[in-house]
């Protein structure tokens, strides 16, 4: 069997790439080798259910899946954070940060089984050849010729030869292991999680009318984070009617052996998050699964090669689930991979691009790793984390999303034009990241019970989410906006270094100026 592209792994990264390539080049020959079987079960399948703006744009707009997402998945009421107070027995007394209404530019809660089943059916309808329950036995990379993959499908041993090999096989890390590309991620965090077959609503934690009225849509639709020293607990709703619950922790502060079963995790929740434990207890009879990763984070020495192989998704880099960046990195990587493949098939020399894209992607990953280093010990402190969350939101919306939505991360000519701006930006990130790592725990009792509403107030009155809809007439206008956003970061950095509460700059929305 011959193909232009063979993708090892038919999960979210691999199927998304196949869909992306067929949309851009309908006659491209793609073979996908997936070890699992279809259809996948809904709910109790994979984590990574929470998407943010980049991933939502990639799946909905770039892959043209918005109709399915709107009909079969759930809208996301942003990220929501609750910080500790006393014994965490009264949620109304916890500092809360989150939106009271849906953002202008949407994000989604994705039932991974349901979404991947639909995506699988779409790529098959697009003409992609997909082998489910296919086990890769060997990969022979031939830089001077066509690569060859041997795999077992049912009782049959088969071979596919191809111009490009893409490893999207997740934690199997086929090419990374074959080529010795493993790299430590410098984070020591773990997670346990489970799904409940019920619509668990965290608003049921209190019948306080004023607290319940803070949000229009139910808090259930947020990715909810219950924060504490060295940990956070998530509650994420799924379109199938189930709820995903997880505990993520710093391995140096919490012992995975104390939560590596459902009963142990319940005991841990009773001690640290009693209201979360009580809410889960109501639905324990609906338990669908339980899984655990003791040490989930890692990087990669190289992800793209001029020898016509690429690594994407969790096969390459996985950082941390906090802020839900997993699918964003699928989007970034697949954009680079797709561009390399299509240019090569048009006869272009992609060797310089492969080196440049590899550098840009791994630098993106390095920046995000830096945002998490030394962070988990501060999770229990509302003042520090308010600063951190607001700062990181400007980084994400004002720079990362701005460049992605305008398709500039793989525009090397444009990146060359903003080299000075990116150097300023990187210096800012490192300076503030170092500050947060060194910052002492500063307590402010006045924060108890406060609500930072990210729908009604914005830093300096600018809704950076809404500004993602601005259409720029040319690159000069986009660069001007980028400089404005970096200027905002510079102003915030001064306050952060002086331990001044930057939430005081939250203001009602001012009208966005046209580009």
Where are these regions (language model features)?
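Short beta-strand to alpha-helix junction loop
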Residues: 100-121, 255-260
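N-terminal FAD cofactor-binding segment of flavoenzymes
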Residues: 40-89
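C-terminal helical "tail/cap" subdomain of flavin- and related membrane-associated enzymes
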Residues: 340-515
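Glycine-rich FAD pyrophosphate-binding loop
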Residues: 22-47
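Beta1/beta-strand and adjacent pyrophosphate-binding region of the FAD-binding site
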Residues: 1-13, 31
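Predominantly flavin-linked oxidoreductase catalytic cores and closely associated redox partners
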Residues: 122-276, 334
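FAD/FMN-dependent oxidoreductases across multiple families
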Residues: 229-231, 237-241, 253-340, 344-376
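Redox-cofactor binding/interface segments in oxidoreductases and associated redox assembly factors
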Residues: 8, 167, 311
